[in-house]
């Protein structure tokens, strides 16, 4: 994934934070005596005194303007309507001597070179991080987009079916005869319906019936001789 490109405001802020090149804070200076009213622009500082000023790069020699030393510094910088050839010659002579200073030219060259280098680096960074730049398209070809599709299959096991319970056989229950009311006789009050209760269940015999000798003897056939003898012995 490409890094986000720096915005224009960020680049402007970086350029503002760079140190200014030499001569950016120049001053107006009056190089020769009080009679000379032609000001000269100094790239670094104006040094000397109010009556004798010259350009220099040493901040310790910089002239300090105040009302005691130079009560009217601005009036001395007024340009006359007509310039004499002597004034022009002296100004050109001072400019040629100032231009021959190698330190001031070297500082300006270094400042310009650093500024161009910073702008070049910022341009390269923008081109390699911005997708709309030609260098980005040449160095970083577009990759095909591969879409991975994952399919998840869920298998549901059948729930166990409950075993059928055996059904008990149904026996026919006892039938009860309903109560049939009698029609009321004329002049007789109607009797209330009696409460019907179901008949009690017949108790099942728990054992064989008791043995009775009389009943056992009566059940024997009359032609049995044993039966006849038993009757004779009974008092």
Curated annotation (Swiss-Prot):
Residues 157-235 are annotated as: Disordered. The keyword Endoplasmic reticulum applies. GO terms for cellular component: endoplasmic reticulum; endoplasmic reticulum membrane; nuclear envelope; nuclear membrane. Residues 159-172, 181-211 have a biased composition (Pro residues). Residues 1-26 form the signal peptide. Spleen and thymus. Residues 27-105 are extracellular. Induction: Induced in a p53/TP53-dependent manner in response to cellular stress. InterPro entries: Shisa, Shisa_N. The chain crosses the membrane at residues 106-126. It is found in: Endoplasmic reticulum membrane; Nucleus membrane. GO terms for biological process: intrinsic apoptotic signaling pathway by p53 class mediator; intrinsic apoptotic signaling pathway in response to DNA damage by p53 class mediator. Can induce apoptosis in a caspase-dependent manner and plays a role in p53/TP53-dependent apoptosis. Belongs to the shisa family. This is Protein shisa-5. It comes from Mus musculus (Mouse).
